[in-house]
């Protein structure tokens, strides 16, 4: 347990995760980053993406989907996010529907007839849907 750290993932609806981990990998605004015990203090914004959790004493990773937020790394790691889901909680058909809706909207709207905020919302919606679909299928990354 000397090389583990407590990870807590909090959403507005629930405490999504609370356990000791050896490694957590998240997508920050500058790319994927891993955090472990004895990591330097950090507070970073998170992008929509997969979260990979290696629990203490395990070689395997638990994979989930998060919808952005921020990570605070001190003597413990805390992630605050609007939504977090495990693969078995994801409604794949709903994700496919959101993906198609966002893709269709982006195909039919241009910068000339939609403002940047609307375009950004559609892109974020598409990214969330794709992330959820990847997580439901076991994650986009290869096993480590």
Region roles according to the model:
Residues 6-8, 12-97, 101-103:
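Compact, glycine-rich, soluble single-domain proteins
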Residues 85-144:
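Acidic/glycine-rich phosphate/pyrophosphate-binding loops and surrounding catalytic core
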């Amino acid at each position: 347990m000397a090389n583990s750290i407590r990870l807590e993932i909090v959403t507005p609806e629930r405490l999504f995760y609370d356990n000791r981990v050896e490694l957590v990998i998240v997508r920050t605004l500058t790319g994927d980053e891993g955090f472990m015990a004895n990591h330097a203090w950090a507070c970073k914004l998170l992008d929509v993406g997969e979260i990979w959790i290696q629990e203490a004493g395990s070689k395997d990773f638990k994979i989930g989907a998060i919808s952005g937020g921020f990570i605070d790394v001190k003597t413990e790691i805390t992630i605050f996010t609007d939504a977090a889901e495990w693969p078995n909680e994801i409604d794949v058909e709903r994700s496919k529907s959101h993906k198609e809706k966002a893709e269709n909207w982006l195909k039919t709207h241009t910068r000339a007839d939609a403002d940047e905020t609307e375009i950004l919302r559609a892109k974020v919606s598409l990214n969330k849907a794709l992330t959820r679909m990847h997580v439901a299928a076991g994650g986009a990354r290869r096993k480590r």
